[in-house]
Amino acid sequence: MMLDIKKTRGFHKIPQASKLQSTTKTSSVVATSASSQNEVPSPGGSAGSKVGATNPVRAANQRFFLVSSYKDPTFLKAECDLAHAHVTTSKVKTTLQPHRRSRAGEDSRNNNYNTSRAPTLINMRRPSLFNGNQQPTTTNSTTINNTTSRNTTSNTSNGVLKYSVRSTTATATSTSTRNYGKLKPLNNNQTTAGVAMMNGHTNNNNNNTRNSSNINNGGNNNMQRQQQQHDDISFIDSDDPPATGGPEAGISTTKTSICYFKPITPPLQLRHEQNQVQQQEEQPQPSSSKSASHRYPRPKSTIIASAHSNFAASFEKFSGGLYRQTNGETNIESKTSSNARRYGIDSLSIKASIEKFNNLSGQKRQNPGSGSGIGPGSATASGLGGGRLSVASRSNHGSQAGGSSSNLQQRYSSDLDNIRVAAGYSSSLTRAAYRTTATMNSVSTPVAVTSELGGPISGDGGETATAMGQPTSKVTVRGAHSNRQPIECDSVVLTNKASKDATTAATPTVATATATHTPATSSVSTVTVTAAAPNSASDSTLARSGTGSSSTARSVLPPMTPTSSRYWDRDSGTSRSSIGTSSALNSSSLKHNSDDGYKTASSSRDEKSEGLCGLRNIGNTCFMNSVIQCLSHTQELTRFLRSHHGSRSLSTKDQQILHEFAKLIQEMWTANVHTVTPMELKRAFSTKHRMYSDYNQQDAQEFLRFFLDSLHSALNSGVKGETLNIDDNLSDNKKADLTWEWYTRHENSLVRDLFVGQLKSTLKCTTCGNTSVTFDPFWDLSVPLPSSSRCKLEACLDLFIREEVLDGDEMPTCAKCKTRRKCTKSFTIQRFPKYLVIHLKRFSETRWSKLSNIVEFPTSDSELNMGSYGANSNSNVHYSLYAISNHMGSTAGGHYVALCKHPVSRKWHEFNDNIVSDALSENHLVSSSAYILFYERT
């Protein structure tokens, strides 16, 4: 009977089921063999019971999984390293008690070897096939107590491996010889199929005896495992009980068995097996006939973990330290042998991890001034002299060096902190590594400044940090790069640059903050912070005094990405030193004349800390977080959104996007809010733009265009239907004005007023000299990069407006010649927008590579002059840089961060998802990672 398999999958033709028929050989008495081709005879010979016909689908899958051509070494490496194959055999009942030995810690070792030759063979390195399977070529003989076991492995010309095992005992009068089944691969290249004991992975013992499944016998535990490489893999499970032997003892039987696949045992089953071992030790050992009837049901679905990962440490937590790895062996306290390394992640562990993440996320809503006392897992860092600060940091293990975004188990579960995903095999929630080095692998929490009385200062200007997790270390807060000198954390005088004519001097004031502990501590701590602001910021000093006891901040969620020590986690609920030291400045000196939306009547409100809010990465959403941070620091847009109040139940999808974006901006610019999750905004945006419904990496500039278009559509109050009629005899400027007026009547919104400019396109025929001029709106300028490795932004703009020749297929139709002619085309800017967005075209359309040219762009106020690129070259148009979207990585994958200038403090900060850095210098803005530049017209 042939099995019908889909030919489109490229499967090999399934041979007849008769290839797996069983044969029976006897030495003295010939046992009765099974009459069916798919039946497996019992070891008892003629008196053995017949198992019955094997499932044909299972047999087909068994043969398919042995096809070597489908063994792709990169298939599901992170989640499913390999599927275990167990040989279903039956063992002749012996009169001796099998020797027990713990083989839980033996990886890639033959479990048949005992103490006599185990040290030599365990340390011997075996050659492996291309898929990691072992190919033994030797014959070994090993003595195990009273039992002599001899294993013979031979290779046949057609790639079939045969195992012949002969066992003799001192007391038994009969001899039983078993020939293990032939596993014939369905290939044509005569390649030997993978055999037992895959190198570097854990072998699971398959003891087909009458004893309980949780007892390891010293008999022959030959196994065979295959690495599954197809996306439609399914575990072949068998719940049929093993065949029992007959009472005859003097019969020597050789039988053929079949491989099947079985999932790895999860921790829940391990706990169950431990309880069974304890019960068996307390109770008398039952007879073999009774123990053979008990079989623990295997789970149908498990998550398989790699034996090469650091999951052993997490498994010790599951088992309460019962299993502890020492030099390749497993020490089990007063316990018999058990399969301790057969572990995985069960659904309860995942559920517990997610619940823990939800609990930690819920804590961010608490008042930062009211925190619990310092627990055993927290640490408080004290300030060092000279203005340098020492902070307590959570060690960022190598498990996070593979990138930002892993799954919830890896990110938020404290029980799974040591999981290491294999390099290059990332999940859908994994980003590319970001600035991962051996010395820059920890994330600093906000500093804790110690007052003269010994207690850390708390409150609005408080500086108390709590480090959560495993080991803590002291690091020095550094500047924009960790290899530079530490920044002296003195008080900073913020100069108001709203007016060009004068600057506002800061006046020394005193800020008082009160922090209240949780009801559990029943104490109130009042702290006074005094900051003196002299005329020069470089000579400024800070005097601190405090009274009362210390208060702690809430727990800190682990960062999404590996970051250097200069980052301060905004999740801690404490203020940054540059903010806390300058908190004594009068609120009137913090007001920006051109931004009434950032003003406040309350002097206790810390305006400089508003907006310094990180955005959590919910799965490869760094491109969205980077763009949102840049738009959040667009002052007029943020001022409008902070006062915008709409309803969630709006008619259009664009209005829903606007509503969620306004809610997000309002929360980001709320005092004492340091991290926000943009889940609702992404959900609303993905409803309209389905390409963003998944969690794949996307282009930030493309997302910016879609996002601004949705905001414009939600606010658009223009009237449609009017046609544009312009006389060709009018001047270019008059044509431009009429075209712009017509466009604004159709597209009327605040977003258009802020970001849209007008581009003049000139087309000139090289034959007749006829010139055609058109005016089109633009949302951003995508400028090409020159071939030099280092250039200026002006060179990119020159390439953008440079005259281009249209020839060949690009030739347009000349209105005067009435045919296609070779023409020249050039651009100039007719109308400049309020906010100019410049996109550096780093991703080549012809090459699948990223251009890493360093573009030197103006960073100071009013430094960029765009007048020479306008249609009217005699005008001066000045712009000031206020935000940058950086991309690190390549076209295959990377990471986005944002560099933004705070509208109040006028300081630069880096927003790396939920991590916000300290104030940066303008010298650190120019890099080869700059991708989108945001300029404000001054």
Curated annotation (Swiss-Prot):
Positions bound to Zn(2+): C765, C768, C814, C817
Comp. bias intervals (Polar residues): 392-410
Sequence ranges of Basic and acidic residues compositional bias: 592-610
Enzyme active site: C622 (nucleophile), H895 (proton acceptor)
Sample GO molecular function, one term: proteasome binding
Cystine pairs: none
Alphabetical list of InterPro entries matching this protein: Papain-like_cys_pep_sf, Peptidase_C19_UCH, Ub_carboxyl-term_hydrolase, USP_CS, USP_dom
Any Gene Ontology CC annotation: cytoplasm
Effect of deleting the gene: RNAi-mediated knockdown is pupal lethal. Pharate adults removed from their pupal cases display severe defects in head eversion, with head structures forming within the thoracic area. Pupal lethality can be rescued by supplementing their diet with CaCl2. RNAi-mediated knockdown in the fat body results in the activation of the Imd and Toll signaling pathways under unchallenged conditions, with constitutive expression of the Toll (Drs, IM1) and Imd (DptA, Def, Atta) antimicrobial peptides. Flies infected with E.coli display enhanced expression of Atta and DptA compared to controls.
Catalysis performed (reactions): Thiol-dependent hydrolysis of ester, thioester, amide, peptide and isopeptide bonds formed by the C-terminal Gly of ubiquitin (a 76-residue protein attached to proteins as an intracellular targeting signal)
Gene Ontology BP term (one): negative regulation of antimicrobial peptide production
Top class in the EC scheme: hydrolase
Bias kind Low complexity: ranges: 22-36, 137-158, 167-177, 198-227, 275-289, 502-555, 574-583
EC number per UniProt: 3.4.19.12
Region Disordered: start-end pairs: 1-53, 91-117, 130-254, 273-297, 360-410, 500-610
Key words of the record: Hydrolase, Immunity, Innate immunity, Metal-binding, Protease, Thiol protease, Ubl conjugation pathway, Zinc
USP domain mapped to chain residues: 613-938
Task of the protein: Hydrolase that deubiquitinates polyubiquitinated target proteins. Required for preventing the activation of the Toll signaling cascades under unchallenged conditions. Essential for bodily calcium homeostasis.
PANTHER family given in the database record: UBIQUITIN CARBOXYL-TERMINAL HYDROLASE, UBIQUITIN CARBOXYL-TERMINAL HYDROLASE USP2
Name of this protein: Ubiquitin carboxyl-terminal hydrolase Usp2
Lineage, uppermost ranks: Eukaryota, Metazoa, Ecdysozoa, Arthropoda, Hexapoda
Protein's gene: Usp2
